[in-house]
Swiss-Prot record:
It comes from the Eukaryota. The gene is BGLU1. It comes from Oryza sativa subsp. japonica. The keyword Hydrolase applies. The active site is at residues 215, 424. GO terms for molecular function: beta-D-fucosidase activity; beta-galactosidase activity; beta-glucosidase activity. Gene3D superfamilies: Glycosidases. This is Beta-glucosidase 1. GO terms for biological process: carbohydrate metabolic process. Belongs to the glycosyl hydrolase 1 family. A beta-D-glucoside binds at residues 68, 169, 214-215, 353, 424, 471, 478-479, 487. It holds the Pfam family Glyco_hydro_1.
Length: 516
């Protein structure tokens, strides 16, 4: 028993020492120097990457969303969003967690922006909570919410962090969902454009980079095809229709995006000199075999994923594969809508994390029509017994750096090489790792090094990519996973909300501060 007690005490001292070292490296002034061995190990292993590896003016930043980091969900005049309603359903979120407080960036924004600055980042891609500005979606303004975003934007500019503002990250005001069905109703187009215009008018003198929606495909598919995200609708759910609703919602999202862009271009862009675009997620799909069927399945998967939104925005119509398969269930654009939608971006953000193999899978007589079954394809995560890549904590996230190269190159070749930036990229660890374990995130360092190397290769091969945003600065509320997933460069103790920079934070500091 004596020997065991000594071992336990030694382990406790080691963990406490690691935690103290990490804590000393964080604080209101950001990263203050070293975190002992972790910093030494991170230093000098950027894999030959530096700022000079990328074009002049290339932007490095981090990304987050309002619902995941702000907290103050029920205070200072903010109205509930569909996610506030969704998390109240027992069993929907791991451990029945909520984002009522999350990492409290609402009060700690200076600390977090200081951390970004100390890491050498140029920009912060944040989102504005629609229901914090308009608690019921339209009408009366919540000026306390406006004041918060003014404080955040002004502080970022004060210390040299460029704001990239996203107008919608999954968090529709619940009042609009209750009033007329939210995104299923065409009224949402004008409501969103009104909200967007208020933001342009209020913040556009300082914000010069706008995004309308983050991952509209996720909004439509997970919210209305399988019901895993708010508002939780699907054919097998309490309410919904997986065969039609995802396409209706996507159509309204595209029109909402284009309507907001139209207002910005007609009324504000020539004065404010800003740019506007949209953020699209893109898993790379690789045919399982070289068979014609599997290669066609891979192309359909790309069409139903990124093409669902980017094809209309670039070419004014849905991909041919969607038109052929979905038929009358796919809404159509009028001539005026085509004119509004086509070309409605100054740039596009690509959120890229992973890649899958796919094989052809044609529906049979028992297959229920749905967005997911319309792909006529099945994702496969290994080939000949070999996984496509190591898996992170999330069951959907495999580490496949070559997928990023192929995704960026595909956007370049398929869509006329639009100006783009990598608007999200990262991996997660389990939520229950200790501080000492969490800050020693060697797998995340290797992930970023390999993915950013592939991004550089794509740029060297001609992709017009102007920036990169890591997801995310902080561990935070990860939607269905609650606090059981950690994507941050900075470890957050969810009990005390203290921030502890991880090895990956020092790695990024070495990368973006290096001029060689």
């Amino acid at each position: 028993m004596g020997h065991r007690l000594v071992v336990v005490l030694l382990l406790a001292l080691l963990v406490a020492g690691a935690a103290r070292a990490a804590e000393q490296a964080a604080g209101e002034d950001g990263i203050r120097g070293g975190a002992g061995a972790d910093h030494q190990e991170a230093a000098g292993i950027t894999g030959g990457l530096s700022r000079r590896s990328f074009p002049a003016g290339f932007v490095f930043g981090t990304a987050a969303s309002a619902y995941q980091v702000e907290g103050m969900a029920l205070k200072d005049g903010r109205g509930p969003s569909i996610w506030d309603a969704f998390v109240k359903t027992p069993g929907e979120i791991a451990n029945n967690a909520t984002a009522d407080v999350t990492v409290d960036e609402y009060h700690r924004y200076k600390e977090d922006v200081n951390i970004m600055k100390s890491m050498g980042f140029d920009a912060y891609r944040f989102s504005i909570s629609w229901s914090r500005i308009f608690p019921t979606g339209t009408g009366k303004v919540n000026w306390k919410g406006v004041a918060y975003y003014n404080r955040l934007i002004n502080y970022m500019l004060k210390i040299g962090i460029t704001p990239y503002a996203n107008l919608y990250h999954y968090d529709l005001p619940e009042a609009l969902e209750v009033q007329y069905g939210g995104l299923l109703n065409r009224k949402i187009v004008e409501a969103f454009a009104d909200y967007a215009e208020f933001c342009f008018k209020t913040f556009g003198d300082r914000v010069k980079n706008w995004m309308t929606f983050n991952e509209p495909r996720v909004v439509a598919a997970l919210g209305y095809d399988d019901g895993n995200f708010a508002p939780g609708r699907c054919t097998k759910c309490t309410a919904g229709n997986s065969a039609t609703e995802p396409y209706i919602v996507a159509h309204h999202l595209i029109l909402s995006h284009a309507s907001a862009v139209q207002r910005y271009r007609h009324k504000y862009q020539h004065i404010q000199k800003g740019k506007i675009g949209i953020l699209l997620d893109f898993v790379w799909y690789e045919g399982l075999t070289n068979s014609t069927a599997d290669q066609a399945a891979a192309q359909r998967s790309r069409d139903f994923h990124v093409g669902w939104f980017l094809h209309p925005i670039i070419y004014g119509e849905y991909p041919k594969s969607l038109q052929v398969i979905v038929k009358e269930r796919l809404p159509k654009f009028t001539a005026d809508e085509v004119h509004m939608v086509k070309g409605s971006i100054d740039y596009v953000g690509i959120n890229q994390y992973t890649a899958y193999y796919v094989r052809d899978q044609q529906p049979n007589a028992t297959t229920l029509p749905s967005y997911s079954s319309d792909w006529h394809a099945a994702p496969i995560y290994e080939r000949d017994g070999v996984p496509i890549g190591p898996r992170a904590n999330s069951d959907w996230l495999y580490i496949v750096p070559w997928g990023l190269y192929k995704a960026v190159t595909y956007v370049k070749e398929k869509y006329g090489n639009p100006t783009m930036f990598l608007s999200e990229n990262g991996m997660d660890d389990p939520g229950n790792v200790t501080i000492a374990q969490g800050v020693h995130d060697t797998t995340r360092v290797a992930y970023y090094r390999s993915y950013i190397t592939k991004l550089k290769e794509a740029i060297d091969d001609g992709a017009n990519c102007i920036g990169y945003f890591a997801w995310s600065l902080l561990d935070n509320f990860e939607w269905k996973l609650g606090y059981t997933s950690r994507f941050g460069l900075v470890y957050v103790d969810f009990r005390t909300l203290r921030r502890y920079p991880k090895m990956s934070a020092y790695w990024f500091r070495d990368l973006v501060s290096s001029k060689n």
